[in-house]
Structures are given as C-alpha cells and as structure tokens.
A protein has these predicted regions:
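A membrane-interface helix-boundary motif in multi-pass transporters
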Residues: 132-165
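Loop-to-transmembrane helix entry/capping segments in MFS-fold secondary transporters
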Residues: 16-17, 102-115
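Hydrophobic core of transmembrane alpha-helices in multi-pass small-molecule transporters
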Residues: 74-89
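Multi-pass alpha-helical transporter architecture, strongest
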Residues: 154-188
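Loop-to-transmembrane helix entry
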Residues: 7-31, 74-75, 155-156
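Intracellular juxtamembrane helix-capping segments at the cytosolic ends
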Residues: 89-103
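Helix-to-loop junctions at the C-terminal end of transmembrane segments
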Residues: 32-46, 134
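C-terminal ends and interior cores of transmembrane alpha-helices
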Residues: 56-69
C-alpha cells in the first residue's frame, strides 16, 4: 500500500496516508475470526471450514487485484476483513483437526508435520513461486516527476494468486474425504 505513495494520483489518498489503519483491520479480523472457529467447526465441519478459508484467500487476492488506495480503498478494506477468515480458518482449524484426528502417540509428530507442510515447506514453495510470478509480471514505469520509480503489473499477479487459490480449493473439495457429524447441543 505504501508503494502507491509514489504515484501522484494516489499520493494523498486515505489508503496511502493511513495504510496502517488498513493493516490493523487484518489484525482485528484475525482476532475476531479465531473466536468463530469452534462454532464453524461444530456447525460445518473441517472440510467446509477449510474450503471457506481457501475461498477467502481467493477473495482476498481478488480484492487486492481490483482495489487501489483511491476510489478502490474499500476493496483493500474488504481484503483486510477476509484475512481473518483466510488465515485462522485454515491454520488454526487445520491444527485443531490434526489434534483431534491423530492418536495421542503420534499427535506431536503430526502437528509438527502439519506446521512444516504449511509454514515450512509450503511457505517456501509458495514464496519462490510467488516471486517467479512477480518477476514475470511486475515492471517499473518511467520515473515520476518527483524522481520516484513506480512499479506496475501487480493486478495480474493478484489475479494469478486468486486463480491458484481457487484451483487448490477445487482440488481440496474433490479429493479431501471426511464425513462431518453434526453434534447436538449437548455435544453428542
């Protein structure tokens, strides 16, 4: 968001001048959404909760692609709001699922594997892949009157990231087999 400050059209907009407020919306959303996890898991089950998270990533990236810190700042705001669902519903719910479904004798190993696959290996592959996309589609525009270099092409990257998240969600919906049993008010 801060990089838009080099573009005269956006330099004095709310989104650029108050980017920290937008970023704080993500933190507030994450704090609130973590409280929703028990309800959503009980009501919809792990498969639907994980799909909701994956679709939230699609929307988050799509909102970034469509938004800007000027007239499209509301799309940035929506992106920040869905972050809590995207992050918490995937990471926290996934961890709770692993904890619930594994035998106590291998639970810590299963949790370690889940963390390594999502935040270790998965994050590394994701970062390298995202960098390849960025290197391909983001480019520098001629310097502005103030002498600042401005970059462009981010919209394409965000659309690619959204499409990738959508493909992952579709594959998860097809291949993840788990039958959720809705419990009554007494937890039975």
């Amino acid at each position: 968001i801060f990089s838009f400050g080099g573009i005269p059209e956006y330099a004095d907009t709310f989104g650029v001048q108050h980017a920290n407020i937008l970023i704080s919306i993500s933190q507030i959303s994450e704090t609130f959404c973590i409280l929703l996890i028990p309800f959503f898991l009980g009501r919809f089950g792990i498969k639907r909760v994980m799909l909701i998270a994956m679709l939230a990533w699609v929307f988050r990236f799509g909102f970034f692609a469509l938004g800007n810190p000027g007239s499209g700042v509301w799309l940035f705001g929506l992106s920040m709001l869905v972050y809590g669902v995207a992050f918490d519903f995937f990471n926290v719910s996934g961890s709770l699922f692993v904890d619930k479904e594994t035998d106590i004798s291998i639970r810590s190993s299963a949790q370690g594997l889940f963390m390594m696959m999502t935040n270790g290996l998965g994050a590394t592959i994701g970062t390298l892949s995202a960098q390849a996309v960025i290197n391909r589609f983001v480019y520098a525009l001629p310097e502005t009157a103030s002498g600042q270099e401005v970059i462009a092409g981010w919209n394409t990257c965000w659309y690619i990231f959204a499409a990738y998240a959508l493909v992952v969600a579709a594959l998860f919906a097809i291949f993840f087999k788990y039958k959720h049993v809705v419990k009554d008010e007494c937890g039975r």
